Structures are given as C-alpha cells and as structure tokens.
Amino acid sequence: MFLAQEIIRKKRDGHTLSDEEIRFFINGIRDNTISEGQIAALAMTIFFHDMTMPERVSLTMAMRDSGTVLDWKNLNLNGPIVDKHSTGGVGDVTSLMLGPMVAACGGYVPMISGRGLGHTGGTLDKLEAIPGFDIFPDDNRFRDIIQDVGVAIIGQTNSLAPADKRFYATRDITATVDSIPLITGSILAKKLAEGLDALVMDVKVGSGAFMPTYELSEALAEAIVGVANGAGVRTTALLTDMNQVLASSAGNALEVREAVQFLTGEYRNPRLFDVTMALCIEMLISGQLAKDDAQARAKLQAVLDNGKAAEVFGRMVAAQKGPTDFVENYDKYLPAAMLSKAVYADTEGFVSAMDTRALGMAVVSMGGGRRQASDTIDYSVGFTDMVRLGDSVDGQRPLAVIHAKDEANWQEAAKAVKAAIILDDKAPASTPSIYRRITE
C-alpha cells in the first residue's frame, strides 16, 4: 500500500518512481481516490524533474490499462492492426486517405481520433460534415466494421484510458500540458488501448505545429517512439513540415472534399501526397505488409490507381451511417458556404512565409472550429486553393478562395489571410515535406 503524498514527495526530491508506485497513482486517478490537488502536484514534479524511460513506459501502460484495451484475436483477422497519430496541424487531412489506403493493402486500421484543438482541425469534426456519419458506433459495431471494411474512424469512448481524461483536465488548468513525458503518456495511452501491432507518429514542425521549435518536436517524436517500442508496439515517427497549410484547403467539409478527390485521383496536392504516402509506407513496413519502401509504395499506388482505396473509403462512410454513394456524389452531400470568392494580395511577390497557426485560427473565427466545447461548428466555411511557399502572386493568382457565411465573415477572414501570408520579391529556398524519420 502506498501513500499518494509519499509518491509526490519522492518525485519532488528527484528520485525515480517504481512501476508499482506509478500504477497505484494512476489507478487512484481513475477511481477518484487521488485528489485534483495531488494530480496537479505530481504533474508539476514531473514537469520539473522529467521521467526516465522506464518511468515513461510505466506511466503510459498504467494509463492504457486504466480502461478497456481492445483485443482483436477472436476475429482471426488476416492482417496487422495498425494506426497513425498526428500531433495536428492545418489542412492535415491525411487520416481520411491513409486509413482506406492501408486497409486496401491488407491492414486493419481502428482509428480513434479527436476533435479540433486550438488552431488544429479535428478528424472527427471533418467526418461529421458528412450527413449521418456516426463517430460513436457501439463496440460490437466498431469491431464489425473493422472486420468487414478494414478501417473505421471513431471518437474516444469513456472506456478507453479514462485516467488520461482526468489527468489531462488537471494539466490543462495547471500549466503542465507541455511536459514531454506527460504528452507522450497521454497520446500513447489512447493509441495503445487500440490493441495495435504497429503505429506511426506524424510529428509536425513549424509555424502551425503543436510544439514551438524543431528541437522540441524532435524530442517528442523520439520520446513517443522510445516509449511505444518499450511497450511492445512497433513504432516509427516522421517529422513533417507545418510551415504551410498541408492540403490545398482548410475547413471541415472542404478538406473532406479534397480527401475524396485525392482518393479518386481527381486532384492530389503534391505535399499532401508526399506526407500521406510516407506515413502509409511506414505503416505497411511496420505491419509487415511490405518488405521495403519500394514494395510499399507500389502497393499503395496500385490501390489508388485501381480505385480500391476510394472504394474502401466509401464503404467506411456507408458502414458508419453516411450516404452509400458519398464518393460518387460528395458535392451533393457536403454543406456549401453562402459566399465563396478569392482574396488577393495588395502587392505582387513570392510567398516567402506563412503563419499557419494564424490561418487555422482564422478558420475557427469563421465558425469552422470551437472556442469552447459547447460551440457548434459551421462545417462549410474555410479556405480552398491555398497558395504554397514559393508561389508567385499577383492580380491573377489569389492567396486563397474564402468560403464564408456572409460578407462580414469573408472580410474578417480576408484580413487574417493577408496578415498571415508574407510576400517577398524573391522566391524562398524550397523546404522538404519530411525532415526526418525516427526509428528508436
């Protein structure tokens, strides 16, 4: 039997906690026998004293085990259980293509996703732009969809990692969110509760990233890979660029539209293609569905070219109570904004920098995201035809097309877009879509 205050004291004094002590504390968070003050105190001691790798693994496993851990063995699936997690960005719609692409190649993707957070868009919010789409099927239905379709994208239920929910709520109001061991534990507790064989992390870098510097993004990626592998799940991470909007669009229905166009081949943004393909390749190799990069790429390109990936997406939408002909008739179903018109720069020049975070917040301000949990979302608003870094803009080439609910909404967004996009008289050096691959 342990005392919570003695565990806090031990960590406060810079000592290493045992697996048993960590499990006792996390179980107390779940059972409400540990107070909010005690959670806050331990979070602050971890913030200042960090955690060893064994402590990080113990924390993650204890939070994972605080609720249901999905077990797929009795389904006798003929492929690996794999998933991807992104730290979030603007125009980051990769999940909507990646899940169906990997499923079409023989993987099973039980993706448990989140809503928008701050300036970043949420996969669940995007999918809810599809009429009828059910993000909370019951457990049996979720398992049936995975078995039949190969991919389902759902929201987190109360049974998955419940200790994390309470721990995070306390961190959020005590300035202890940005601690790498605590971020790592929070992300992985939920992902590892999916019962995965393999995981790939997409850790963003740049002006629209969760972590403010390259070094911190790199440290987070290394921590997640180390802990997840320590927990027995094959995991790699990619550091990917978020110094510009990833897709050509930002906004819920607009990004769903671009995802369908990507899958059908109607339109594929080159940077979005690079990042999506690279993440899928990691999943196929880690899931032992391909022996190397070249084989994985060939398989993925084949399911795009033969329409199988688009078909899987359509089947997933139908299985989750969306329209059965969504892929064929997406424009019929997705909500459209009242006003769509281009915004132009006041001067000519090359796009040299972009405040991606500000562009994400502009979508939120238009009604495309939440400032508080009770807000309702306008799924139709946002941007399309976004410029890229290095593009030349003038009276012919707009910065973006703004989809707004009215003229005042459009004017406010236009001001934000102009302020967020920096022009220069010469083109900047090109930046990679992917900075680094981390395997250990």
From Swiss-Prot:
Gene3D superfamilies: Nucleoside phosphorylase/phosphoribosyltransferase catalytic domain, Pyrimidine nucleoside phosphorylase-like, C-terminal domain, Transferase, Pyrimidine Nucleoside Phosphorylase, Chain C. Pathway: Pyrimidine metabolism; dTMP biosynthesis via salvage pathway; dTMP from thymine: step 1/2. Pfam families: Glycos_trans_3N, Glycos_transf_3, PYNP_C. Signal peptide: none annotated. GO terms for molecular function: 1,4-alpha-oligoglucan phosphorylase activity; thymidine phosphorylase activity. Its EC number is 2.4.2.4. NCBIfam families: PRK05820.1, T_phosphoryl, Y_phosphoryl. The enzymes which catalyze the reversible phosphorolysis of pyrimidine nucleosides are involved in the degradation of these compounds and in their utilization as carbon and energy sources, or in the rescue of pyrimidine bases for nucleotide synthesis. Belongs to the thymidine/pyrimidine-nucleoside phosphorylase family. This is Thymidine phosphorylase. It comes from Salmonella arizonae (strain ATCC BAA-731 / CDC346-86 / RSK2980). The lineage of its organism: Bacteria, Pseudomonadati, Pseudomonadota, Gammaproteobacteria, Enterobacterales.
